[in-house]
Amino acid sequence: MTAYGLQMYSLRDVTEKDLRGSLKTVADMGYQYVEFAGFFGHAAEDVKQWLHENGLVCSGTHTGSDAIRPENIAATIAYHKAIGCKNLIIPGMDWSTAEKMEENLALLNTAQKTLAENGIALGYHNHSGEFLKRDYGSVIEEEIIARTAVELEIDTFWAFNAGLDPVALCERLKNRIRVIHLKDGIPTAAENLKKGTP
Protein backbone atom coordinates (compact mmCIF):
# COMPACT_ATOMS: atom_id res chain seq x y z
CA MET A 1 0.00 0.00 0.00
CA THR A 2 1.28 3.45 -0.95
CA ALA A 3 1.86 5.87 1.92
CA TYR A 4 2.03 9.61 1.28
CA GLY A 5 3.99 12.09 3.33
CA LEU A 6 5.49 15.57 3.24
CA GLN A 7 9.12 16.49 2.69
CA MET A 8 9.81 19.03 5.42
CA TYR A 9 12.06 20.98 3.04
CA SER A 10 8.77 22.31 1.67
CA LEU A 11 8.45 24.26 4.94
CA ARG A 12 12.10 25.27 5.10
CA ASP A 13 11.28 28.92 5.78
CA VAL A 14 9.69 28.01 9.11
CA THR A 15 11.15 24.66 10.22
CA GLU A 16 14.49 26.10 11.27
CA LYS A 17 12.73 28.64 13.50
CA ASP A 18 10.04 26.31 14.85
CA LEU A 19 10.41 22.64 14.02
CA ARG A 20 7.93 21.55 16.69
CA GLY A 21 5.26 23.96 15.46
CA SER A 22 5.91 22.95 11.86
CA LEU A 23 5.26 19.31 12.71
CA LYS A 24 1.97 20.25 14.34
CA THR A 25 0.99 22.19 11.23
CA VAL A 26 1.80 19.22 9.01
CA ALA A 27 -0.25 16.90 11.23
CA ASP A 28 -3.16 19.35 11.22
CA MET A 29 -3.07 19.26 7.41
CA GLY A 30 -3.74 15.53 7.59
CA TYR A 31 -0.30 14.09 6.90
CA GLN A 32 0.86 11.03 8.82
CA TYR A 33 4.40 10.76 7.46
CA VAL A 34 7.22 13.26 7.25
CA GLU A 35 10.66 13.22 5.69
CA PHE A 36 13.01 15.52 7.55
CA ALA A 37 15.43 17.93 5.90
CA GLY A 38 17.48 18.80 8.95
CA PHE A 39 16.94 18.79 12.71
CA PHE A 40 18.48 22.21 13.43
CA GLY A 41 20.33 21.09 16.54
CA HIS A 42 17.34 19.51 18.27
CA ALA A 43 17.97 16.39 20.34
CA ALA A 44 16.63 13.10 19.03
CA GLU A 45 14.48 12.61 22.14
CA ASP A 46 12.77 15.95 21.53
CA VAL A 47 12.08 15.14 17.89
CA LYS A 48 10.75 11.73 18.90
CA GLN A 49 8.37 13.38 21.38
CA TRP A 50 7.15 15.92 18.81
CA LEU A 51 6.43 13.15 16.33
CA HIS A 52 4.54 11.19 18.97
CA GLU A 53 2.44 14.10 20.20
CA ASN A 54 1.31 14.79 16.63
CA GLY A 55 0.74 11.19 15.56
CA LEU A 56 3.46 11.43 12.92
CA VAL A 57 5.92 8.84 11.64
CA CYS A 58 9.35 9.71 10.24
CA SER A 59 9.40 8.05 6.83
CA GLY A 60 12.94 9.20 6.14
CA THR A 61 15.53 11.94 6.38
CA HIS A 62 17.54 13.99 3.93
CA THR A 63 20.96 13.80 5.52
CA GLY A 64 24.22 15.23 4.20
CA SER A 65 26.92 12.80 3.17
CA ASP A 66 29.29 13.93 5.95
CA ALA A 67 26.95 12.17 8.39
CA ILE A 68 27.66 8.77 6.82
CA ARG A 69 31.44 9.05 6.94
CA PRO A 70 33.11 6.46 9.21
CA GLU A 71 33.81 8.98 11.97
CA ASN A 72 30.17 10.16 12.08
CA ILE A 73 28.01 7.22 11.12
CA ALA A 74 27.58 5.77 14.63
CA ALA A 75 26.00 9.01 15.87
CA THR A 76 23.86 9.18 12.73
CA ILE A 77 22.60 5.65 13.30
CA ALA A 78 21.83 6.37 16.95
CA TYR A 79 19.82 9.48 16.04
CA HIS A 80 17.79 7.65 13.38
CA LYS A 81 17.08 4.75 15.72
CA ALA A 82 15.98 7.13 18.46
CA ILE A 83 13.34 8.75 16.23
CA GLY A 84 12.28 5.44 14.67
CA CYS A 85 13.54 6.27 11.19
CA LYS A 86 14.53 3.43 8.85
CA ASN A 87 15.34 5.43 5.71
CA LEU A 88 18.31 7.76 5.30
CA ILE A 89 18.47 9.63 2.00
CA ILE A 90 21.50 11.48 0.68
CA PRO A 91 20.09 14.58 -1.07
CA GLY A 92 23.10 15.21 -3.28
CA MET A 93 26.88 14.98 -3.52
CA ASP A 94 29.74 16.66 -5.37
CA TRP A 95 30.17 14.72 -8.62
CA SER A 96 32.33 17.31 -10.39
CA THR A 97 35.28 15.03 -11.16
CA ALA A 98 35.86 11.35 -11.85
CA GLU A 99 37.95 11.16 -8.69
CA LYS A 100 35.11 12.54 -6.57
CA MET A 101 32.72 10.12 -8.22
CA GLU A 102 34.90 7.19 -7.18
CA GLU A 103 35.19 8.54 -3.63
CA ASN A 104 31.43 9.05 -3.39
CA LEU A 105 30.59 5.59 -4.69
CA ALA A 106 33.03 4.02 -2.22
CA LEU A 107 31.49 6.02 0.64
CA LEU A 108 27.96 5.04 -0.39
CA ASN A 109 28.91 1.36 -0.54
CA THR A 110 30.62 1.37 2.85
CA ALA A 111 27.83 3.31 4.53
CA GLN A 112 25.08 1.23 2.93
CA LYS A 113 26.46 -1.94 4.47
CA THR A 114 26.85 -0.39 7.92
CA LEU A 115 23.38 1.14 7.86
CA ALA A 116 21.79 -2.09 6.63
CA GLU A 117 23.37 -3.97 9.53
CA ASN A 118 21.51 -1.53 11.78
CA GLY A 119 18.14 -1.81 10.04
CA ILE A 120 18.41 1.45 8.09
CA ALA A 121 18.15 1.69 4.31
CA LEU A 122 20.41 4.13 2.45
CA GLY A 123 18.96 5.98 -0.52
CA TYR A 124 20.02 8.70 -2.94
CA HIS A 125 17.86 11.62 -4.13
CA ASN A 126 18.44 12.84 -7.66
CA HIS A 127 18.49 16.27 -9.19
CA SER A 128 18.75 16.80 -12.94
CA GLY A 129 22.53 16.55 -13.02
CA GLU A 130 22.64 12.88 -12.06
CA PHE A 131 20.93 12.00 -15.35
CA LEU A 132 23.25 14.04 -17.58
CA LYS A 133 26.59 12.85 -18.93
CA ARG A 134 29.49 14.44 -17.10
CA ASP A 135 32.55 15.92 -18.79
CA TYR A 136 34.43 12.78 -17.79
CA GLY A 137 31.88 10.57 -19.56
CA SER A 138 29.81 9.14 -16.70
CA VAL A 139 26.08 9.40 -15.96
CA ILE A 140 25.91 9.44 -12.17
CA GLU A 141 22.49 7.83 -11.72
CA GLU A 142 23.56 4.88 -13.86
CA GLU A 143 26.83 4.57 -11.92
CA ILE A 144 24.89 4.48 -8.63
CA ILE A 145 22.53 1.84 -10.01
CA ALA A 146 25.30 -0.34 -11.44
CA ARG A 147 27.94 -0.02 -8.77
CA THR A 148 26.11 0.25 -5.45
CA ALA A 149 23.22 -1.37 -3.59
CA VAL A 150 21.90 2.06 -2.61
CA GLU A 151 18.18 2.50 -3.12
CA LEU A 152 16.75 5.39 -5.09
CA GLU A 153 14.56 8.31 -4.20
CA ILE A 154 13.36 9.51 -7.59
CA ASP A 155 12.44 13.18 -7.81
CA THR A 156 9.97 13.27 -10.69
CA PHE A 157 10.37 16.95 -11.53
CA TRP A 158 14.16 16.88 -11.65
CA ALA A 159 14.03 13.75 -13.80
CA PHE A 160 11.62 15.52 -16.17
CA ASN A 161 13.85 18.58 -16.16
CA ALA A 162 16.72 16.37 -17.37
CA GLY A 163 14.62 15.25 -20.34
CA LEU A 164 13.34 11.93 -18.99
CA ASP A 165 9.80 10.58 -18.75
CA PRO A 166 9.32 10.18 -14.98
CA VAL A 167 6.65 7.50 -15.40
CA ALA A 168 8.85 5.36 -17.65
CA LEU A 169 11.83 5.96 -15.37
CA CYS A 170 9.95 4.82 -12.27
CA GLU A 171 8.69 1.75 -14.09
CA ARG A 172 12.21 0.84 -15.25
CA LEU A 173 13.73 1.31 -11.81
CA LYS A 174 10.83 0.09 -9.67
CA ASN A 175 12.91 -2.61 -8.01
CA ARG A 176 15.44 -0.03 -6.78
CA ILE A 177 13.08 2.77 -5.79
CA ARG A 178 12.46 3.27 -2.08
CA VAL A 179 10.71 6.62 -2.21
CA ILE A 180 9.31 8.90 -4.91
CA HIS A 181 9.23 12.67 -4.70
CA LEU A 182 6.18 14.00 -6.53
CA LYS A 183 6.96 17.64 -7.18
CA ASP A 184 5.43 20.27 -9.42
CA GLY A 185 7.39 22.51 -11.70
CA ILE A 186 6.74 24.16 -15.03
CA PRO A 187 3.25 23.39 -16.47
CA THR A 188 4.56 20.96 -19.09
CA ALA A 189 6.16 18.91 -16.32
CA ALA A 190 2.88 18.80 -14.42
CA GLU A 191 1.04 17.69 -17.56
CA ASN A 192 3.56 14.92 -18.07
CA LEU A 193 2.90 13.58 -14.57
CA LYS A 194 -0.79 13.23 -15.38
CA LYS A 195 0.02 10.44 -17.84
CA GLY A 196 0.49 7.90 -15.09
CA THR A 197 1.01 7.25 -11.42
CA PRO A 198 4.73 6.73 -10.74
List each model region and its residues.
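Charged helix-capping and loop-helix junction motifs
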Residues: R20-G21, E71-T76, M101-N109, Y136-E142, ...
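N-terminal pre-domain/capping segments
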Residues: M1-K86, E151
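Glycine/Thr-rich phosphate-binding loops of Rossmann-like dinucleotide-binding domains
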Residues: V14, A44, A98, L132, ...
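Acidic/histidine-rich catalytic cores of soluble enzymes
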Residues: E117-P198
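Active-site beta-loop-alpha junctions enriched in small/polar residues
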Residues: Q7-L11, A37-F39, T63-D66, G92-W95, ...
